[in-house]
Amino acid sequence: MKNINPTQTKAWKALETHFAANKDRQLSELFAADPARFDKFSTTYKDNILVDYSKNLITDETLDLLIDLAHEVDLRSAIDAMFNGEKINHTEGRAVLHTALRNRSNRPVMVDGKDVMPEVNAVLAKIKAFCDSVISGEWKGYTGKAIQHVVNIGIGGSDLGPVMITEALRPFKNHLQMHFVSNVDGTHIAETLKNVDPETTLFLVASKTFTTQETMTNALSARDWFVNIAGDQAHVAKHFAALSTNTKAVAEFGIDTANMFEFWDWVGGRYSSWSAIGMPIALSLGFENFEALLEGAFEMDTHFATTSYEQNIPVLLALIGLWYNNFYEAESEAILPYDQYMHRFAAYFQQGNMESNGKYVDRNGNKVDYQTGPIIWGEPGTNGQHAFYQLMHQGTKLIPCDFLAPAITHNPIGDHHPKLLANFFAQTEALAFGKSKEAVEAEFLAAGKTLEQVKDLVPFKVFEGNRPTNSILFKQMTPQTLGALIAMYEHKIFVQGIIWNIFSFDQWGVELGKQLANKILPELNSDAAVTSHDSSTNGLINTWKAWKA
């Protein structure tokens, strides 16, 4: 990959000039000037996902210049490098091949001269056999009962993805009851264990190294709870499986290594749901639906790798997002799914985006002098409308938003879905076009008020509009559709990282806090006052010691 400061490119400088000339243009003006704007600035993917980006503060020239930027930083070679297994995770010396995990074409993918696909397919076959055994009831616990509950113990990428996907695809779930434990706060494991029966519970311990502090603390507590009731350490083998690569530690824990499911160092945590980390997904939905999830992502991978930038959905979304982040100085993006099943979707891509592109050092090791990754947040509609949309409509911050919704619901109860979609359609219209002072006054006049009576109220009811949004309407939530949506956002994040000239696949920012926590933990086991830190940290620790006594 080339190391190019984007702000020094011809395209960036042209974008600065273009922005200065167009920053005050109104969406209402752009739509009025071009009746075909929706047709021009929307695209349908596989007759299943409509991406409408017409309500953005862009023109043909804006997109042309943004695409010029993608060419000038040589995005094409970066895409090829990722798919071809080059070690683009430079700081860790690793390839980045979550795409190989869902490579349904079985095209050879080489890492260090070796095709990884035979191993990928072998692990998938092992996952399928395990899932089929558990789901069918063939797998028995220590008292001969079939498994009814599955507890996934992981954190970060070993938790967020499986939680989000199993929730988003709940209409496809089977009889197994899924539980997820991530927080090292003992409350999380304690409350979960209240709801399961050791005779019918399978624990999945998801940690590549089998040393992750939070995960192993929870796993050891779960094992102690289980052995205390089951009465025999040997029974652990029938109730625990590992998603890991540390054979020695897995065996020492008491797990049969035949029930250890491996993945590779070229799988990043936040991209690992396609690997053995996706075991709870396959257990909850059945392996066939897990395969459909992979298929959907693979099809989006193919679209991303082969489609011209002008029609390439992840590239277009990335470029439009960069336009706001780096030129309009927007600090955040909201992801707003109008689908209750997708209630963890924004949280999942909060990690996916902020852990990937929350970097202030470029690929040359220099501090950047431009903005990189945005803050990602969001909640499902319509809940968010009664929480934070006030600021989106009338606040002082520009917040580009992605609105997502299924055309067809899995729960056709009365007129719930038409009401949900009425809000989905209304919000992007309201954000784009607002309500003028004249329109507010006309409403009051129509209600029999005089302008003199309402003059003090009018300013508060004006909506400026010109708030940009993408609308992503899909036919119905299915495993294949969700796979495509996840891959779409993954590739959007990748494209932005390439243009910003940062490494998107490491996460050194999580290390310092962990190191300090490991230093502080022994200090908490002593009653002596702590003086080795700054006055604030010393004061916090010593107050805790006094209060817990």
From Swiss-Prot:
InterPro entries reported in the protein's UniProt record: G6P_Isomerase, G6P_Isomerase_C, Phosphoglucose_isomerase_CS, SIS_dom_sf, SIS_PGI_1, SIS_PGI_2
Pfam families: PGI (PF00342)
MF (Gene Ontology): carbohydrate derivative binding; glucose-6-phosphate isomerase activity; monosaccharide binding
Gene Ontology CC annotations of this record: cytosol
CDD domains cross-referenced by the UniProt entry: SIS_PGI_1, SIS_PGI_2
Catalytic residues (UniProt): 355 (proton donor), 386, 514
Top-level enzyme category: isomerase
Known function: Catalyzes the reversible isomerization of glucose-6-phosphate to fructose-6-phosphate.
Protein name, as recorded: Glucose-6-phosphate isomerase
Source lineage: Bacteria, Pseudomonadati, Pseudomonadota, Gammaproteobacteria, Aeromonadales
